């Protein structure tokens, strides 16, 4: 009798909560920030996992669209302009980030239809 209790397993290598959830975003850090931020008296164990998953999904979505915008402009590096184009051309992201100003993002190219030259139906001879 070695005093170990009833034949329990030896503790193996520790595994982060992010890797358990299959996420890249840090679940532990988000949990700490939720506790320190005084958002609520208590924070459940699932809340930081869910929040990390949502944040990771949004980041992946924006980066995917910004990468496409960069490729369309024949660039290999994403700049704020590509982020702006990606967000403003996507209906849902534009609604979510409508109050956000992106520094060095520029504006969407848009010319009102009335300002465009008239299409003449008859050809001049």
UniProtKB/Swiss-Prot annotation:
Region (Disordered): 1-23
A Pfam entry, by short name: Histone
Compositionally biased tracts (Basic residues): 1-18
Function: Core component of nucleosome. Nucleosomes wrap and compact DNA into chromatin, limiting DNA accessibility to the cellular machineries which require DNA as a template. Histones thereby play a central role in transcription regulation, DNA repair, DNA replication and chromosomal stability. DNA accessibility is regulated via a complex set of post-translational modifications of histones, also called histone code, and nucleosome remodeling.
Keyword terms: Acetylation, Chromosome, DNA-binding, Methylation, Nucleosome core, Nucleus, Phosphoprotein
Cellular compartments annotated: Nucleus; Chromosome
Modification N5-methylglutamine, positions: 104
Subunit structure: The nucleosome is a histone octamer containing two molecules each of H2A, H2B, H3 and H4 assembled in one H3-H4 heterotetramer and two H2A-H2B heterodimers. The octamer wraps approximately 147 bp of DNA.
Species per Swiss-Prot/TrEMBL record: Urechis caupo (Innkeeper worm)
InterPro entries: Histone-fold (IPR009072), Histone_H2A (IPR002119), Histone_H2A/H2B/H3 (IPR007125), Histone_H2A_C (IPR032454), Histone_H2A_CS (IPR032458)
PROSITE patterns listed in its UniProt record: HISTONE_H2A
Gene Ontology MF, one: protein heterodimerization activity
Modified residues (N-acetylserine): 2
GO CC entries: nucleosome; nucleus
Positions carrying Phosphoserine: 2
Designated name of the protein: Histone H2A
């Amino acid at each position: 009798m070695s005093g170990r209790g009833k034949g329990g397993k030896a503790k193996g290598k520790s595994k982060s909560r992010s890797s358990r959830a299959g996420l890249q975003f840090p679940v532990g850090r988000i949990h700490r920030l939720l506790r320190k931020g005084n958002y609520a008296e208590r924070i459940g164990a699932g809340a930081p996992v869910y929040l990390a998953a949502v944040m990771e999904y949004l980041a992946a979505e924006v980066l995917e669209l910004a990468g496409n915008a960069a490729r369309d402009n024949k660039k290999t590096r994403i700049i704020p302009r590509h982020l702006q184009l990606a967000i403003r051309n996507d209906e849902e992201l534009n609604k979510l980030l409508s109050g956000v100003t992106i520094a060095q993002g520029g504006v969407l190219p848009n010319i009102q239809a009335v300002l465009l030259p008239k299409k003449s139906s008859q050809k001049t001879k």
